[in-house]
Amino acid sequence: MVSNKHDDFSEDDFSDQEDGILLQKKKVVRDAFSKEDSDVEEGISDEEADVAEQPHSEDKEESAEAQLEQNKAEQTNEQQAGVAEPVSEEKRKQSKIDKIIQRKAGQKLKHKTGVVYLSRIPPYMKPAKMRQILSRFGEIDRLFLKREDEAKHKQRTRGGGNKKIMYEEGWAEFIRKRDAKLCAETLNGNIIGGKKGSFYHDDILNVKYLPGFKWADLTEQIARENDVRQAKLELEISQSNKLNAEYIRNVEQSKMLQNMRKRKDHEDRDQDARRQFKQHKVSTNRADAPSSIKNKSETSVKDVLSSLL
C-alpha cells in the first residue's frame, strides 16, 4: 500500500512536470511569435512617432510665436502702465477720499449729528490741532474756524506782534450727538490739558452745545452773511463809481467853460482894439471948410509977417 501510494505520488509529480515543460514550450513559442509581432508593432510605432513628432514640433513653434507675442504685449502694457501710473495714483487717492466720505455719510444716517460752538480759540492754534483735541471725545466730521480780520492782523503785526494766523471762533460737527454733548460738558471753562509741557496745556476753551442746530444751518448763515457782505460791497462800489463819474463830468465841464471864457475874452479883445493918438489942430484950405477957419489962417500969417517986419 505504501508502495502504491508512493507510485501514485510519483506519477502525479511526473505528470505535473511534463505539463510544466509543455507549458514552458508553448510560452517560448508564443514569445518567439510575440517578438516578431513586437517588431512589426515597433516598426509601426516608429513611423507613427515620426509622424506624431511633426505636429509636436509645429506646436512648439506656434507656442514660441505665441510666447513672443505675449511678451511684446506685456512690454506694451508695462509701458502704458508706466505712463498711466500718476493717473492711477490720483484715482486711487480720489477713491479713498470718496470711500471716507461715503463711510461718514453712512454714519451720519445711522446717528444724529451734533454741533458745538467755540467762542474762543487759543492763540495761533491751527485747525488740525483743534481737531486732534476734540477727537478725544468722538469722531468729528467737519470743523470750521473763522480767521481774524485782515485789519486786525495788520494792526497787530505793525505793532510788532506775531505774524502767525489767529482764529477768533469756530464750529465743530460730531457724528454722534452724545459725543458733542460730552465735549461741551467736559471742555467748557476748563483747561485743555494733555502733556504738562505742551504749548496749549493751560489754555481755557469756551465750548457750547447747540441743540437743534445742524451744519446746514451754519452754511446757510455763512452764505447769508457772505451775500450781505457782497451786496454791501457792490453798493459801495456802485456809489464810488457814481461819485467818480460825477467828479469826472464836473472836471470836464469846468475845463470846457474855462476854454469858452478864454475864447470869448480873446474875441472881445480883438473887437475892442481902439487906439487913441494925440493930434494937433489942423487948419484946412479946403473948399468945404468953414470960412472962420480960412480967415483965421490968413490973419495968423499976416500977424507973423507984421511981427517980422
Swiss-Prot record:
Biased composition (Acidic residues): 9-19, 38-51
InterPro entries tied to this protein: ABT1/Esf2, ABT1/ESF2_RRM, Nucleotide-bd_a/b_plait_sf, RBD_domain_sf
Region span, Disordered: 1-98, 257-309
Span of domain RRM: 114-204
GO cellular component, one term: nucleolus
GO biological process: endonucleolytic cleavage in 5'-ETS of tricistronic rRNA transcript (SSU-rRNA, 5.8S rRNA, LSU-rRNA); endonucleolytic cleavage in ITS1 to separate SSU-rRNA from 5.8S rRNA and LSU-rRNA from tricistronic rRNA transcript (SSU-rRNA, 5.8S rRNA, LSU-rRNA); endonucleolytic cleavage to generate mature 5'-end of SSU-rRNA from (SSU-rRNA, 5.8S rRNA, LSU-rRNA); small-subunit processome assembly
Keyword field: Nucleus, Ribosome biogenesis, RNA-binding, rRNA processing
Compositional bias ranges of the Basic and acidic residues kind: 88-98, 265-275
Superkingdom of origin organism: Eukaryota
Subcellular location, record wording: Nucleus, Nucleolus
Listed Polar residues bias regions: 68-80
Keyword Transport carried by entry: no
Purpose: Involved in the small subunit (SSU) processome assembly and function, and in the 18S rRNA synthesis. Required for the early cleavages at sites A0, A1 and A2.
Similarity field: Belongs to the ESF2/ABP1 family.
Official protein name in the record: Pre-rRNA-processing protein ESF2
Organism (species): Candida glabrata (strain ATCC 2001 / BCRC 20586 / JCM 3761 / NBRC 0622 / NRRL Y-65 / CBS 138)
